[in-house]
Amino acid sequence: MRKLGLALSIMGLLLVSIVAGCIGGGTETKTEAKKVKVAILFDVGGRGDLSFNDMAYLGAERAKKELGVEIEYMTPKSKEDMKPLLEQLAQSKEYDLLVLVGFLWTSPLNEVADKYPDQKFALIDSTTGKVRENEVDILFREQEAAALMGVIASGMAYELGGDTIGAVAGMDIPPLWKFHIGYLFGAKYFEKKTGKPVKLLWQYTGTFGDTQVGYNTAMQLLQQGAKVLYGLAGLTHVGMFDAVKDWNEQGRGKALAMGQDASQEWYAPKYIPISGAKRVDVAVYDAIKMVVDGTWKGGIITLGLKENGVGYWDLDGVKQFAEFAKEAGKLKDMTPDEVVQIVKEQREKYIKPYVWDIVHELEEKIKSGEIVFKTPKTHEEYEQIIRELEKGNLNAALEKGSVE
């Protein structure tokens, strides 16, 4: 779920932004050790998306600073350029690791990886479905973040005088099934802990790229009584943000929104007090660290709360993305510090201490492994879990553990 920006190109294929930092001032020494060299291959659109690509940049910059690696950033001109670019880089044998950001790299990687067994690849937020020694796929346990967001949304709904929460979701695909299960689980967990009933209105839009559809869907959910809407549709849910803003400013009622993946509070901090986090930056850093440490092992890795791979954004994260928005010319009426102050005030107003207590309790159960969420393998299994959760059967969503 991400918003695509303008793609830039050099040599007809890519934009290469070489981050120096690998050469200090002064004369080179003869004994200088060879640095690990990494290429970060952004999704189409590159930097400035205020989402996946910018988070990948954060993770790579952290690796450069903490691990001393050399980083190059590259953006394909289009989807058609992805495979040629990937093949070109693998052929060059210049890079210890190629990090591929986003699901659009899945098919190109499947076509290229077997040809270059000595080239290491890391695919972020997708999987080729094949286990290779030279490939690591890093996925996220979305249920864990969504469960916390379900608790938070439920608490905010009651502060707004209602008992209904909603979600504007993208396409009916497995990652969204996990979000749905987690979000509903969190709402029912809140219900069980407080005795306050919570109703969830979940709506698939069928798109990740249509703001008008997001706006219209959000308005329908607000008209049905939703007090808090969770955006799970990429660019589409930016329209949801606009709808919530209009709903409040037109005097039609009080409502709040929650973002997802990157910190999105900067977009309308008065109405978006919190965002769920999918830490692409952590995934990128971890992949690079495996190469540096010599702990590389091909296969699929999942990141959740325990690994700091998912969760919700703290105020430092809010400020970081507000600064990105400012750099991109999208934060025009306030400073990043003002965004943080507004968000802090809104969180204090709408997310009460008892709600944070429930969030932290659930968070600890997940981190410790006391409870583990199921990952549905079929749509039928997904639907069955949702039906059971709606009845209040929280254990239907769990692979391990139970909620009494």
Swiss-Prot record:
GO CC: one term?
Answer: plasma membrane
Q: Where is the lipid attached (S-archaeol cysteine)?
A: C22
Please list which residues make up the signal peptide: 1-21
The compartments listed are: Cell membrane
Q: Which UniProt keywords apply?
A: Acetylation, Cell membrane, Lipoprotein, Membrane, Signal
Indicate how the chain sits in the lipid bilayer: Lipid-anchor
Q: What Pfam families does this protein's entry cite? A: Bmp (PF02608)
Please name the InterPro entries in this protein's record.
BMP_lipoprotein, Peripla_BP_I, PnrA-like
Task: State the family it belongs to.
Answer: Belongs to the BMP lipoprotein family.
Q: In its UniProt entry, what is this protein called?
A: Uncharacterized lipoprotein PYRAB04520
